[in-house]
């Protein structure tokens, strides 16, 4: 689905190799390569290498190993969604209906758009019926639809107050 160019170690740089980003080490965030390396990947998501590009001399700040540019594709995730949302090819908003059981999507935030790729089966979670689906996360949650109710108000922009009449 979503493809990005990133860097991986020379040992990982094989077409078809799959890996999961568990978390980004603090040392990576201060590295000059971070924006084109770990900065392009999302913790909790799995990736598959689809193209290996020529080595350009980059070295990892942590391991001092050779880093090779590759094109990765985000691998689909598996999780539970309500049966009424489980249609192949449909884009839905993840609302966290399933929470707390083994099949619940841990890598997706409430409000995030997901695309259902395939329906794999059925399961129960907290007494509800859910579908086991393979899906892609399409991006971060959209801004609050409450019209800014969660935003703090600037008192200098409030309408002028009027004294109460007696």
From Swiss-Prot:
Signal peptide: none annotated. It holds the Pfam family UPF0179. It comes from the Archaea. Residues 157-166 have a biased composition (Pro residues). Residues 140-166 are annotated as: Disordered. Belongs to the UPF0179 family. This is UPF0179 protein Tneu_1978. It comes from Pyrobaculum neutrophilum (strain DSM 2338 / JCM 9278 / NBRC 100436 / V24Sta).
């Amino acid at each position: 689905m979503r493809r990005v160019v990133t860097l991986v170690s020379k040992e990982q740089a094989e077409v078809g190799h799959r890996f999961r980003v568990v978390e980004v080490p603090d040392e990576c965030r201060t590295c000059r390569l971070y924006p084109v390396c770990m900065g392009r990947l999302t913790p909790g998501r799995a990736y598959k290498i689809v193209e290996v590009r020529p080595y350009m001399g980059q070295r990892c700040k942590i391991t001092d190993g050779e880093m090779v540019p590759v094109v990765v594709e985000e691998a689909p995730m598996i999780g539970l969604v309500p049966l009424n949302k489980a249609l192949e090819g449909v884009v839905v908003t993840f609302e966290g209906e399933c929470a707390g059981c083994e099949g619940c999507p841990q890598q997706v935030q409430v409000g995030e758009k997901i695309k259902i790729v395939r329906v794999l089966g059925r399961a129960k979670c907290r007494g509800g019926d859910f579908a086991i689906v393979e899906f892609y996360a399409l991006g971060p949650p959209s801004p609050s639809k409450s019209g800014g109710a969660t935003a703090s108000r600037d008192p200098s922009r409030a309408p002028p107050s009027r004294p109460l009449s007696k």
